[in-house]
């Protein structure tokens, strides 16, 4: 039996005024303004633009780190292409062709950008981007498309509830955005984690596809499916609260800015400012979880005792070694990295959706 919202019948408005009834039916029939294919195109375009803007900054950061303290063979380091972090392992056989091991005498970020572009070519600023985009692009597309559809569906249900059952309490719209963000992120990380683990193994040990097949079978035989989710728990410890806070904040900031600027608001500017602000808020609140996640993941490839440490033990070790300040270290660099990434990705995603909707 369809609900009044699904059927759209005005006879179920329970005596509400006709204008309110019509508005309620319109609200309950609301659909996404763009199709799934257009969402995929918009998120892909936004992801590419984001990575093109953000990758040079991380390439320079890694080159500066390598210059100060060269990576020992087998050591893990993080590569961030603006969309997601990738655990990279310094190759066991050093080759001059590895981009992060190229010599350089850099005196800072600006100096590094100029020298890399001048002596190695402008394309060197995007070193390592192609292999990481193989993972980041589908993960980002899946994440944004899932979020968008789930968020619209939840908000539609809430709108119907307010219209047809005003006596009942209904959660605010930002809560729908938070739930949709959490669910979408959980699914995306769960799907991507095993593939990312295999990619890291292939990169670090130069394994062939036959050797990868043997590794998968032996891992399944010894530890089961959990062997492919070694970093899942610490990742979700950070990503679940971050996604919830980010999307709730983005929805709130965007709604308030649209209301203040009126119908003539610039959708790109509103999305950019809202995304940047939401990214800052989410980063501040979830930074301790990010530090814990990093400390958990850098143990991968270490001793057996280090790898088998629980999250609780890792937290205790961090507190005993540096006190409460251990959980706030690196906040400013993370804000510099995350806030513009969020702003660029969401603004271009919304902009491309707007273009598709306008053309449609």
UniProtKB/Swiss-Prot annotation:
What domain of life does the UniProt record list for this protein's source? Answer: Eukaryota
TM region(s), chain numbering: 40-60, 125-145, 178-198, 225-247, 269-289, 327-348
Question: Which Gene Ontology BP annotations are present?
Answer: import into the mitochondrion
Q: How does it sit in the membrane?
A: Multi-pass membrane protein
Q: Keywords in UniProt for this one?
A: Membrane, Mitochondrion, Mitochondrion inner membrane, Repeat, Transmembrane, Transmembrane helix, Transport
| InterPro entries for the chain | Mitochondrial_sb/sol_carrier (IPR018108), Mt_carrier_dom_sf (IPR023395), Mtm1-like (IPR045315)
What the entry lists under Pfam families is as follows: Mito_carr
- Where are this protein's Solcar repeats? 34-153, 172-256, 266-355
Tell me a GO cellular component: mitochondrial inner membrane
Q: Where in the cell is it found?
A: Mitochondrion inner membrane
Family (UniProt): Belongs to the mitochondrial carrier (TC 2.A.29) family.
Protein known as: Uncharacterized mitochondrial carrier C16C10.1
* Species annotation: Caenorhabditis elegans
